[in-house]
Amino acid sequence: MRFISLISVVYALVLPTLAQEPVGCDKFRWSLDKERATLTGTDLPKVASGSEVKWPLPFATMIALVPLVDAKLPIAPERSPKSQDTFGGSIQIAAPAKAGTYKITLSSAGWIDVVQDGQRVRSTAATGATGCEGVRKSVKFELAASPFTVQLSGVEANTIGLVISGE
């Protein structure tokens, strides 16, 4: 019985640290140096949630979000936010020049969904770290050469920086 109690204590102490994301700009699974430089710049164009945008690669913007309860997202977020007191929004992107792998990188924490041809696009890889000014998360998606929507949810602030870059 003492052994089981000891195991329970060890799990209680160890599991929370295993679930934490790494800290530092060198902890991402792939280099985000260019995206970080872009997101920490002061001249990012600003767009409102719901905007349609065209893009040369890399595409970068600050998105003005709305309270999540007011966000008109094309599909329900794949993951429910931890709190309904967060922000969300979406932008519609013109078709990329060619199909391929694209990274969507955020300046702060938030959930990213991509919708293309009316369907959710599953991510192929993701990386995140805390303690890196300007960059918090990056997710890769295989996109067709057709328009798509990036929708964000669970964001704590009413603006977020976003970069879309090719692989």
What are these regions (language model features)?
Residues 1-4:
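Positively charged n-region of N-terminal signal peptides that target proteins for export
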Residues 20-167:
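Acidic, Ser/Thr/Pro
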